[in-house]
Amino acid sequence: MCGIVGYIGQSDAFPVLIEGLKRLEYRGYDSAGVALIGNQDNLNVYKTKGKVSNLEAMAADKDCSGHIGIAHTRWATHGEPSAANAHPHVSMSGELALVHNGIIENYQVLKEQLADKGYTFKSSTDTEVLVQLIDHYYQQNGKDLVSAVCQALNDAIGAYAITVMEKKDPGHIVAARQSSPLVVGVGKDNKDFYIASDATPIVEHTNKVVYLEDGEIADIRVGEELNIINLEHASCSYTIKTVDLDISKLSKGGFDHYMLKEIYDQPNCLKDCMSGRLIVDQEHPENNHIVRSALRDYRDRLVNAKHIIIVACGTSWHAGLIGKQLIEKMCRKRVEVAYASEFRYVDPVIEPEDVVIAISQSGETADTLAAIKLAKEKGALIFGIVNAVGSSIARETDTGVYIHVGPEIGVASTKAFTGQVTVLTLLALALGHEQGTLDDADYHEMIEELSEIPQKMEKVLEQAPMIKSLALMFTYAHNFLYLGRGMNFPVALEGALKLKEISYIHAEGYPAAEMKHGPIALVDQDMPIVFIATHHQLYEKIISNMQEVKSRNGRILAIVTEGDELVKNIADNEIEIPKTQNALIPLLSVVPLQLLAYYVAVDKGLDVDMPRNLAKSVTVE
């Protein structure tokens, strides 16, 4: 991992590749590199540890000519972050260059076999093994690159997205994928082709793309139609799709960081998410309804399902925990929330009548994709909740809903979380009303309340200056505890995750009642305790939990419902959110926690958008 860019065509390749890498910086990385076949048919490779800007500076006085090239941002999986381990990797013959996302699981065996044939290695990566393996077959079969790629990939076990080029033919480039995303952009009259891990580096050049499927190889030649085959050389049909992606949404829009922009984007993002789905009639609330297009084709299976399994990772898993409570309350169905990374390895009980909901911002999360493939094999209906249109998970599911919050660039997810929770709320409302477990009055009232969330979220954002001041009091801390109950317990988990992701402060989220079963031993005046203490059915109980902390000299920051005087008498500091229905509280209570994490990290002088060791899209298991 993490980001691939390739170009072949009539333009100078280097600017296209560098700008493409910059578009992919949000995915997270620790090194970067580029390879070009120059105007004199020389293969030039430049690699460096650190930022794309470092690579750009390094290449400033180098030969960057040529109309074909490949580039990569690497997030270390095999081998430490270094220039030697950075991609592209070049074959020992010097004739091939390759970039790769994924993990070749049997690389050690392949490496030993190649070493016996005289191959030597300059890095400790699985990627270099792959390019040497391709080169081995390339030298054997008369330097037919496509055949060599097919033979090598038949030997390789694991996940990959690769792009490879050959020095002898600067009009030819080959790309392939297996369990790792890869997109090919098609220029006018096939005069230019663009390759990338996702569409963001491509859309400023062309909106015509082909999403490669598992086991497919793209054989690309300038001026010719795109040719896609499988590993047995059989031709594969494909569809050129039109991508609708607003490039302006990829900018910071005047904010210091993408993360802050995306926090402030949330009111408008939720309006977009609900647009055309949530119909509100102010004069006649009895006409309020949800457009149920996602339920239409699979209505009976969704209504009749007795067991729903939600699979997700990270922030999406926290959204799934909220979805569980929403669906169980409104639809009276049994819901299980599983870590996608663990799901396949516990021999899960999945019946053909079950529904599996997969949640992923990128739509490319490897563990989630593998989980739904298993569930599909067992006959379950797969329902996707993703942000990235055309992504692997979106294509693998039977039905689903896009959250439509626009590209999320900051590694720490914000607007995708609230978008996912909004879609889960829409799903629970629609399904509950469809099957009669949610009565008309509650259904219509909830729709009206949900439509008001963006406006209420704006009121929360107005408190950002105060939250910024509060954050200054907490940068000293080495540990945080986040506590909530009911719908606010997943919010506590999400708040803790945001803080640890970008500020590198250890933080844990717990159900508030579990505090007395261990975490209370940590409470002292140096450990901030964040309570999400809004009005809900467990309000009195969380007040009791706060008193327990207060009696042990704990420092309390509370998220409270506006007008709450009781909590103010206990907490050291508080942040108010507007009143709303219990089921919708997470959409508001999470926003102050996002801002708190952001301002703590900024005060510590950290790179908020690209925190260390993290990748935006985790495309390896």
Where is each model-derived feature located?
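Glycine-rich phosphate-binding loops that contact phosphosugars or nucleotide phosphates
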Residues: 303-445, 449-452, 534-573, 596
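Structural beta-sheet core signal
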Residues: 4, 98, 164, 175, ...
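Active-site phosphate/pyrophosphate-binding segments
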Residues: 154, 266-270, 274-309, 399-528, ...
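Conserved short alpha-helical segments that host acidic/polar catalytic motifs at enzyme active sites
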Residues: 1-252, 256, 261, 268-307, ...
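Glycine-rich oxoanion-binding loops at beta->alpha junctions
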Residues: 50, 67, 71-84, 281-300, ...
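Glycine-rich, anion-gripping cofactor-binding loops and their flanking helix/strand elements
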Residues: 182-188, 192-209, 315, 341-375, ...
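Generic C-terminus detector
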Residues: 259, 555, 568-570, 580-621
